[in-house]
Amino acid sequence: MTNIRIGQGYDVHQLTEGRKLILGGVEIPFEKGLLGHSDADALLHAVTDALLGAAGLGDIGSHFPDTAAEFKDADSRVLLRAAYQSVQAQGWQAVNVDTTVIAQKPKLAPHIPQMRANIAADLGIDISCVNIKGKTNEKLGYLGRMEGIESQAAVLLVRI
């Protein structure tokens, strides 16, 4: 058994009217939000998937199914913390998190410091160990047409 593991996570949600836009646990002013069973925080869902995957614990859907009433409109920070408790129970600790959020709009840069702080707090790691990159899709495809927002995440775990 190795003492380090890498996990990769991915999530995408459709942009729609009548929903709040929440990324990294931050409510971002925008005319549309992400559609989903929970708060549809694509960034935190990708981080959660990366953590669970690195620990060999499946994915976010197996722990928090979108068919379960108790997760309707759930705060994804709560889900992230619960998933991380499962990861820690298996003897793993997060070392760092590196993420990319692809969104044509809105501009994410003003919100990245708070997103980083939220993830660092939820995982109990230093903010310097959390990175978030905001990218556009250069107006290409469904992301470029502002039909959705996509997130990718990588995490490094060490045995504790």
Swiss-Prot record:
Names of the cofactor(s): a divalent metal cation
Key word Metal-binding present: yes
Pathway: Isoprenoid biosynthesis; isopentenyl diphosphate biosynthesis via DXP pathway; isopentenyl diphosphate from 1-deoxy-D-xylulose 5-phosphate: step 4/6
Superkingdom to which the source organism belongs: Bacteria
Any GO BP annotation: terpenoid biosynthetic process
Swiss-Prot/TrEMBL site (Transition state stabilizer) positions: H37, T136
PANTHER family the record matches: 2-C-METHYL-D-ERYTHRITOL 2,4-CYCLODIPHOSPHATE SYNTHASE, CHLOROPLASTIC
Name assigned to this protein: 2-C-methyl-D-erythritol 2,4-cyclodiphosphate synthase
Native source species: Neisseria meningitidis serogroup A / serotype 4A (strain DSM 15465 / Z2491)
Gene of this entry: ispF
